[in-house]
């Protein structure tokens, strides 16, 4: 990526465009995630309809079905819903691991100046929702406080699906910011899950898991993509991490971290991390996450005490954290960063745009539901968490739609400018003259 340090005397610009190669890569990612977001929404809606239909018992029976009762020796006698959360989401987190490594080695996060904005925004978007949740639940104390991390996550696929529905054409700099913010957000979520939501910890299986992870890393570092060897090694690593008490999805991240980013040979078009990300992202976005959403979102509201749900501190804390906390954290930290560094917004961006993106980041679906399952296993509290995450995400989506749709005319004009290639060399003019 080219150096984007502004000339001396010129104010630094926030949300400026990336380089053209990075823009093309991000466009491919966003297309896949947008499609996956549509499937995610479909899975969640089907789950809600089924769980509240006369056939709700069959939904519960499907979710609780144990496909391998004989796996008790390895603690793998899991029901389908748990397989979706612990198994399929490991694919999602493997892609996250690839994303993180690519961003830190060859993407925006390798440059401290460009990394500062999404990192500061993500940290603010984690701390403020957590503080709001804790503040609301402090009096209740006890088990309620275990849910402090639920409203801290951002679901990029859900957010992109909302953008597709409202027909918004966010400027490239804002799209890059939203995606990088989500990547940093995922890193923080992984750290939180590994540290705060580990069960009965066993050191020996975790240490043994390092062996298949190391062998996996050795093969991919040598550019050996022998699936007959890599997939069994990944399964063994996942099994051992699961046995250790650390959430099994962490294995996916660790495996992703072992994959090299830079091209091994001069003739290679892409590094192996980008190649594997291209292969596995459709599986993650198009299958793993929608199936998890199908099993995680099926909360039954039939006969529920709606008054009790609405006044439950857990529910209030999650909804307030997602809707208010994310906006205050992301918008506020970005505003303070601009003030302290005397930076200016890119010419095509307004503070209203950032407000809309901050609201989009309040859509915390997949990882929020996962953390909710880890914090409150089943029961009334577990169902209330699902209802709260769904409610908060829908409110955030509606508010973001209201804010961003008002700027659609300007976004279409910017999108046309970003496509203009007057000399027909395959690179739009704005990416050749980014300082102009």
Swiss-Prot record:
One MF term in the entry's GO annotations: sodium:proton antiporter activity
Similarity field: Belongs to the NhaA Na(+)/H(+) (TC 2.A.33) antiporter family.
Residue stretches spanning the membrane: 35-55, 80-100, 116-136, 147-167, 176-196, 201-221, 226-246, 283-303, 313-333, 354-374, 385-405
Function: Na(+)/H(+) antiporter that extrudes sodium in exchange for external protons.
GO terms under biological process: regulation of pH
Name the record gives this protein: Na(+)/H(+) antiporter NhaA 2
Natural source organism: Salinispora arenicola (strain CNS-205)
Catalytic activity, as annotated: Na(+)(in) + 2 H(+)(out) = Na(+)(out) + 2 H(+)(in)
Major place of residence: membrane
InterPro entries listed in its UniProt record: Na/H_antiporter_dom_sf, NhaA
Superkingdom of this protein's organism: Bacteria
Annotated compartments: Cell membrane
Entry GO CC: plasma membrane
Record's keyword terms, sorted: Antiport, Cell membrane, Ion transport, Membrane, Sodium, Sodium transport, Transmembrane, Transmembrane helix, Transport
Membrane topology: Multi-pass membrane protein
């Amino acid at each position: 990526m080219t150096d984007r340090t502004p000339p001396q005397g010129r104010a630094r610009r926030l949300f400026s465009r990336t380089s053209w190669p990075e823009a093309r890569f991000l466009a491919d990612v966003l297309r896949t995630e947008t499609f996956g977001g549509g499937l995610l929404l479909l899975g969640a809606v089907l789950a809600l309809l089924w769980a509240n239909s006369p056939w709700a018992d069959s939904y519960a029976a499907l979710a609780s079905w144990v496909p391998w009762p004989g796996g008790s020796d390895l603690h793998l006698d899991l029901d389908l819903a748990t397989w979706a959360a612990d198994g399929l989401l490991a694919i999602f987190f493997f892609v996250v691991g690839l994303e993180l490594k690519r961003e830190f080695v060859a993407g925006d996060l390798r440059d401290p100046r460009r990394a500062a904005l999404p990192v500061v925004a993500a940290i603010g978007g984690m701390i403020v929702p957590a503080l709001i949740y804790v503040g609301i639940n402090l009096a209740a104390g006890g088990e309620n406080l275990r849910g402090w991390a639920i409203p801290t996550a951002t679901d990029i696929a859900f957010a992109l699906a909302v953008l597709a529905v409202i027909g918004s054409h966010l400027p490239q700099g804002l799209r890059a910011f939203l995606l990088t913010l989500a990547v940093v957000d995922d890193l923080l979520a992984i750290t939180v899950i590994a540290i705060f939501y580990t069960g009965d910890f066993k050191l020996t299986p975790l240490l043994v898991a390092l062996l298949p992870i190391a062998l996996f890393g050795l093969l991919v570092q040598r550019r050996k993509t022998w699936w007959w060897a890599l997939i069994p090694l990944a399964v063994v690593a996942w099994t051992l991490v699961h046995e250790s008490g650390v959430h099994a999805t962490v294995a996916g991240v660790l495996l992703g971290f072992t994959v090299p980013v830079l091209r091994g040979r001069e003739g290679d078009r892409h590094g192996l991390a980008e190649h594997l990300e291209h292969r596995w992202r459709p599986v993650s976005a198009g299958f793993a996450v929608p199936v998890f959403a199908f099993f995680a979102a099926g909360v039954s509201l039939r006969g529920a005490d709606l008054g009790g749900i609405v006044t439950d501190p857990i529910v209030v804390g999650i909804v307030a954290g997602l809707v208010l906390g994310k906006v205050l954290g992301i918008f506020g930290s970005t505003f303070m960063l601009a003030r302290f560094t005397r930076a200016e917004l890119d010419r095509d961006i307004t503070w209203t745009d950032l407000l809309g993106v901050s609201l989009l980041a309040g859509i915390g679906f997949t990882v929020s539901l996962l953390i909710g399952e880890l914090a409150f296993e089943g029961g009334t509290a577990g169902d209330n968490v699902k209802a709260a995450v769904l409610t908060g995400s829908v409110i955030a989506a509606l508010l973001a739609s209201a804010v961003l749709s008002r700027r659609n005319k300007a976004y279409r004009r910017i999108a046309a400018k970003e496509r203009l290639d007057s000399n027909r060399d395959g690179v739009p003019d704005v990416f050749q003259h980014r300082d102009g």
